[in-house]
Structure formats: C-alpha cells, structure tokens
A protein has these predicted regions:
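Bacterial N-terminal signal peptides that target proteins for export
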Residues: 2-12
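Intrinsically disordered, low-complexity regions enriched in Ser/Pro/Gly/Gln/His and often acidic
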Residues: 5-6, 49, 185, 291
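C-terminal motif of bacterial Sec signal peptides marking the signal peptidase cleavage site
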Residues: 21-23
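Bacterial signal peptide processing site
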Residues: 25-27
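Acidic, serine/threonine-rich low-complexity disordered tracts
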Residues: 30-162, 202-314
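Surface-exposed beta-loop interaction hotspot
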Residues: 158-204
Length: 314
C-alpha cells in the first residue's frame, strides 16, 4: 500500500513539474511575441548622427512655448501651447517608459503637447503624447490624448502592436466607451516627432493618414485613415510641411527650421468649425513660437523654479 502511495506522489509531482515548465515556456513565448509585435513591421534602423546624440541625449528636455489663437465654437480664443520633446527608453511589451535598462527597450523621442485656452466662462486643457522611435524605422509605438473642460473629460489611446489598438472614453453619447483595432497607416500625431528626427523622410504625395486624436475627438469624427495630400516646401531658412484632407475640409501646416535640430516655429490648422457639416464655416487656429528652453524640467519642481515659466512667457 505504501508503495502505491509513494508512486502516486511521484506521479503527481512529475505532472505538476511538467505543467509548470510548459506554463513558463508558454509565458516566455507569449512575452516574446508581445515584444516583437510592434517591431514586426519595422524597417532598418536609421543611424543617429553625432549632433543628434549630443542634442537629444544631454540629460534634459526641449521646451518651446507658443502663443495660441484657437478656433472653437465659431470664435477665436487666445491661449498658450507648449511642446515638450525628450528622449527616453520605452518598454516594448508594456508600452510605457522604462524605469530600468533592458536589452529590449526601444529609444524614443517623446512629444508632450499641451494647449490651454478659455471658451467663455470655462477653460479647456488639452494634452497629446506621442512616442516615436528615434531610429525612424516604424510607426509611433503609442499615442494618447486627453481633454478636460467643465462639461467633462475625454481620453483616447492608441497602441502599436500587430495592429493599432485603440481605446477611447468620452462623456459624449456619440463617442462613449470604445475599444477596437485598425490597420496601420501614417499617424498625423507621429509626424511632429518625425520632423524632429528625420524631416527629409516625411511622407509626401497622395497618401492615407489618420488625423490627430485632438481633431478627431473635438470634431466628433470617425477615427480612421483619410485620403490626404502632403507637401514639403522650403523658403529661406524654413520648411513647411502641409497636409490637406479634402473629405474633412481641413489643412494643417507645420513650419520648422531647415537646419538641425529642426525646431518647430509655428503651425496653422484651417478647418470647417461646424460640427454637423450643415454649413461651411472655415476658421484657422494658429500657434507662433515664443521661447525655447532646454532643461531637466522634472528636477525643477520647487517654488524657486517658478521664474522658469516667466522665461517661457507662460
């Protein structure tokens, strides 16, 4: 009898060990698959120049403030916008900033773009983030957008995996909560990063582009790729990248310096401000550069650092 019990225990431990090993193996395969999802369509890496490394890996961020003239609800609003560019390591699996060094980390140029303006009695606060590989060899790994005003909040996020995975939350009934996938196309949100990384490789001609999440959410349009015409022109020390969407009656122009580090000087967005498209009311939002500051802002959070906002005109 003891012999059989001993045999049963031995068999049980063998089965459990086999399950554990297979489980770990499957988890490893799953993790490997997740790590390679975003990079499965990656092109050869672009080599980083010495000036790029010196400028973007100096241990600080580039912060540029802009005077904003924002069209909203059929009227022009005065406000400010800030573009914060900084390089950081990115976790391929979790698609967040890496806290530790790891061989699978992807170096990205992150853009945090903010806008603040008033619509009558209540304020608008908008922020978009895009994480673009510095080697310019694939789409942005992640894009997110949020807007806050007194009516409520809106949030949307795109993750670059086998497909573009989107989640969206809104207080508007027409948008509500959504979760879906899309085929990969050029993202308008990633082109701002691409200008800073490799402007000579900007897509031009008749192409399919997914408009910015800011535009899509604030205009209540469908998030999808739209036919667009993109051009890149040069005038003196500046270049202008223009995207026109015929179906949306919308044109975006981004003006940036012709020489490295390709700082964005201004932009304009002309669009039909009528949400229901019942009447064409074309208006143009504009942003013009005020000041640029390079600093590790995450270390400048004391009251004695408030003067830095003055240096940015904020």
């Amino acid at each position: 009898m003891k012999k059989y019990i001993k045999f049963d225990y031995l068999t049980l431990w063998t089965v459990l060990f086999s399950i554990l090993v297979n489980s770990c193996s499957e988890e490893k395969k799953s993790n490997t698959a997740l790590l390679t999802e975003a990079s499965s369509t990656a092109n050869p890496k672009k080599e980083l120049s010495d000036e790029f490394k010196k400028y973007w890996y100096a241990g600080d961020a580039e912060i540029t403030s802009y005077r904003l003239e924002q069209a909203r609800y059929g009227e022009m609003r005065e406000g400010t916008s800030v573009l914060i560019f900084v390089t950081e390591p990115f976790l391929a699996k979790k698609q967040v900033k890496a806290d530790e060094h790891h061989a699978d980390n992807i170096p990205v140029l992150k853009l945090n773009s903010t806008k603040k303006y008033l619509t009558g009695i209540y304020p608008y606060s908008i922020m978009s983030s895009s994480f673009y590989p510095v080697h310019d060899n694939q789409h942005a790994l992640k894009v997110s957008f949020s807007a806050q005003e007194w009516c409520g909040q809106v949030y949307a996020q795109l993750n670059n995996r086998n497909k573009f995975e989107i989640i969206s939350h809104s207080y508007f009934a027409s948008d509500a909560d959504q979760e879906f996938e899309m085929d990969k196309e050029i993202l308008e949100d990633e082109l701002w990063n691409k200008i800073r990384v490799n402007p000579n490789n900007l897509p031009v001609g008749t192409i399919q582009i997914i408009p910015s999440m800011e535009y899509i959410r604030l205009s209540h349009k469908e998030l999808k790729a739209y036919k667009a015409t993109a051009t890149l022109t040069k005038e003196n020390e500046f270049k202008t990248y223009q995207i026109s969407y015929p179906e949306l009656d919308r044109t975006l122009k981004i003006k940036f310096s012709n020489a490295f580090p390709y700082i964005i000087d201004s932009w304009s967005e002309t669009f039909n401000s009528d949400f229901d498209n019942k009447a064409k009311t074309m208006m143009s939002s504009k942003a013009t550069k005020m000041k640029t500051l390079k600093t590790p802002y995450w270390q400048k959070n004391g009251n004695n650092h408030l003067s830095l906002r003055d240096s940015l005109g904020l």
